[in-house]
Amino acid sequence: MIRRPPRSTQSRSSAASDVYKRQREKELLIDSESFCMLPWMHLHAYPDGRAYPCCFAFDPYPVGDLNKQSLKEVFNGDKMKEMRVRMLNNQKSRGCMKCYDQEKSGFFSLRLSSNKHFGHNVPLVHNTLPDGEADFVMKYWDIRFSNLCNMACRSCGTWFSSNWYEDHKKLTGSPPPHAKVMKVGRSTNDMWEQMLESFEHTEQFYFAGGEPIIMEEHYRILKELDRRKMYHVRLIYNTNFMRTTFKDIDVFELWNKFDSVSIGASLDAEGDRAELMRKGTVWKDIVANRKRMIEVCPKVDFYISSTVGLVNSLHVTDFHKSWTEQGLIKPADFNFNLLQHPIWQRMDILLSLIHISEPTRL
């Protein structure tokens, strides 16, 4: 007969285990130089199906292909499992080098931000198997359903804008190595059906594109969240802000139903400059959309997500000042994203081209 240990012994053992788990969680979230919460609760996908652990992962190192594999297969594929094992052992992964480089320069990286905002999910780590397999739980979604877009921004290309297709043919003499409009998934409803299986766990959606405001899938998600009354789910957008309606739907009315909505408008300049930099922009419509948004959904967070490069580096601060003075944004509602590609539009080549007589304008 096997005797059970005294209850007090069991309690002490359980308490010790809990203390160890809490200490381990602190080590991972605060002390580790490689751990990131995202590989335990998230996947990112390009419109062509390439899957990554997040949107900031290094392009040459995808972890799967959602046009051939399911979300579950990618989530617990060899590359994701290896990444988790490395993170748990405080070893860095080559696909995460962008975050490591930012941290070396003193920036608050996506890795650090994810550990801060999703750190409450760290108990998921305790179920990780020795080979890195983890429970398939999708808390944060960032699937770029399509490259469908109503614009052709100078700093973009065919992978993220269907409107770039004809320009690419004119510039190169041949079509891109993919369809004009790409859609992620193994079939028409494949991604949607997989999402529904994990919908109940969702904490956050990030919508980008292409242009999410003109994508059918975007509204399908919002309507499903509305049907389930999941208004606590955080919605984050990156949009060119040219459109605020789709068919008979006013997106402002949908946003008003949710507790937390944050709109990052991709605007790099104003007036004629804006229309030059982002082909398809009608500036008066951008201004009208912002004014209507302030009136219709004033509680929705709005900020400008500006890509700063060679073309706008000397006047982007003028744009910020103008919109602040007009009351269209608050001074802090302006993010500067340094352009990395294409390299001939990078801001740092200015130093080899001109003598800066007014360095404060940078």
What are these regions (language model features)?
Residues 1-20, 354-362:
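Single conserved hydrophobic/aromatic residue that forms the stacking wall/gate
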Residues 10, 30, 89-93, 143, ...:
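Processing junctions and N-termini across compartments
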Residues 22-117, 137, 340-353, 357:
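Accessory C-terminal segments flanking Radical SAM cores
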Residues 74, 116-131, 169-191:
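Short microdomains enriched in Cys/His and/or Lys/Arg
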Residues 95, 103, 148-152, 157-160:
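Short pre-active-site segment immediately N-terminal to redox-active cysteine/selenocysteine motifs
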Residues 105-140, 149-151, 172:
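Recognition helices and adjacent regulatory flanks at domain boundaries
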Residues 138-148, 157-187, 199-217, 228-247, ...:
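Core AdoMet radical
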Residues 311-324:
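Catalytic cores of alpha/beta
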